[in-house]
């Protein structure tokens, strides 16, 4: 079956040190790049794209992926930003991709496969994997019980589903629950977090990841490449607690 076009949505606020990670995530996707669109909603004081020259350079780096960049002078909640990006999206399939998560190359394809297998209109994982660069790159994991606890950064859904549910809640934590609550049957399906992403613990996390550092230790089960490790070190080099 032919793969559909997908709009990838990234909300950001003063996360420019994560630009190399964002570009790496896009580049590694095992998906036809000409079928992808990247939408950025930025309300930071340090703009992601500061000039027409910057815009031209980013477009060149991610080509043939198309880029839509929007900057707003007033800081808004993550839920508001996610809703705005969906409305700006060209395509009928939406994938969330947050700034500070390391995505697996399989994220888009495996999510789409699950959507088709289950006849779902939204898929995502209620599991989470965390990596702690400040603690010798320890990796831990948790598994939540409910579909409403699907991690927003792992969501792939249709615009039709978004419109039917009224979008994300207008807050910055747990905003994705409104995309699941009240949706019965198999319209919402669960993906494996190992096919999606790893959350990176750092000082600027929206939700403090330190609370999960003593959960299940899966360090030996996750094979991070030296390139991935060096990328994280470079991104967090200004954080005092990282062991470089």
How should these model regions be labeled?
Residues 24-35:
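Short, acidic, metal-binding catalytic loop of nucleotide-sugar glycosyltransferases
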């Amino acid at each position: 079956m032919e793969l559909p076009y997908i709009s990838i949505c990234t909300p950001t606020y003063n996360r420019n040190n994560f630009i190399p990670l964002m570009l790496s995530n896009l580049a590694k996707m095992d998906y036809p790049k000409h079928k992808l669109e990247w939408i950025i909603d930025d309300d930071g004081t340090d703009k992601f794209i500061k000039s027409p020259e910057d815009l031209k350079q980013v477009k060149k780096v991610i080509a043939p992926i198309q880029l839509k960049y929007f900057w707003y002078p007033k800081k808004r909640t993550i839920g508001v930003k996610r809703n705005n990006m969906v409305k700006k999206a060209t395509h009928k399939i939406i994938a969330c991709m947050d700034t500070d998560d390391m995505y697996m190359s399989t994220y888009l394809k495996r999510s789409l496969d699950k959507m088709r297998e289950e006849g779902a209109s939204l898929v995502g994982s209620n599991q989470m994997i965390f990596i702690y660069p400040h603690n010798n790159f320890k990796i831990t994991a948790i598994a939540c019980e409910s579909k409403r606890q699907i991690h927003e950064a792992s969501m792939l859904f249709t615009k039709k589903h978004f419109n039917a549910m009224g979008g994300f809640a207008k807050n910055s934590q747990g905003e994705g629950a409104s995309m699941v609550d009240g949706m019965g049957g198999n319209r919402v399906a669960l993906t494996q977090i190992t096919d999606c992403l790893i959350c990176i613990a750092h000082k600027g996390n929206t939700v403090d990841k330190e609370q999960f550092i003593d959960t299940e230790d899966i360090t030996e089960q996750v094979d991070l490449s030296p390139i991935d490790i060096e990328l994280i070190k470079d991104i967090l080099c200004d954080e005092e607690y990282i062991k470089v």
